[in-house]
Amino acid sequence: VTLRLAISGFGRIGRMTLRAFQEMRHQDMEIVLINSPGPVETSAHLYEFDSVHGRAVGTVTHGDDWMDVGSGKIHMSRERDPANIPHAAHGVDIVLECSGKFNSREASAAHLAAGAKKVLVSAPCKNADQTIVFGVNDSLLTADADVVSNASCTTNCLAPVAKVLADSVGIEAGYMTTIHAYTGDQPTLDSSHKDLRRARAAAMSMIPTSTGATKSVGEVLPQLQGKMSGSAIRVPTANVSVVDLVVTTSRDTSLEEINQLLTAAANGPMKGVLGINERPLVSIDFNHDPHSSVADLTQTSVLNKRLVRVLAWYDNEWGFSCRMLDNAVAIGKFL
């Protein structure tokens, strides 16, 4: 049975999720509906031409209420209220809620009222039935979870590495810094924002700010609840971020062991989600990398046998968008 998906919100993640669907050639799903309040012409143009990921594969055509990116016509709706999106009329199984505006169970459940069977939210979601990081806790997904959170791009990078360490050498405490590319909520020139640092010009400063990733990693890996803290520094690059994780371990370990553990996970149970790098690369080299997390083995450090540092790269747009589709398939198995 082919899963029928809708994308609601056609910004960075919505567009990249559609591109990932096209590039990965998912045979077990089809995108039947996209909801975006803006003009269809704008959606089609921004899908086809992207400053970060280049031009889309294939030919893009559109009409008044449809767009075709190479897999047949997709109906385009322009509703601002999710309750009015024609999910029922298009037989939508799962909505990928990518607008960034309905990040609570109550708000995103409007999609269910409109006829969708399940909702997958592309962000941390307050009171979600479950938060699932694919490759880390997707085995815990249940049939009765109607609103599922895909967590954040940073949680998707942190959680695989944290799980590998927690399951082997143990984590007593950990601190994560994400050195993060600027995102669409930051201005090009100083502007008002409730976070006075995020109010500043994105491409001109390193900007210390908060991250919810360490809190939500405790939801995904309950054994780490209360053991992790973290912060973010937004830097003047357009895409690709890096998690710098430092933990104290429960037992003695070595640099060699840590790298062996990460390599074994990347080649085994976390293949496709966790990657490894052993070459002298920089952030742009990970643009369009489909992994959630790429551990850079050249940067691993172990001090006094118990203070461990791991660096993990992630394309904060593309990797996360690929996981939206993986989680949709996982949720679809219950339909």
Residue ranges and their predicted role:
Residues 10, 14, 104, 151-154, ...:
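Generic structural signal for well-ordered, non-membrane alpha-helical segments
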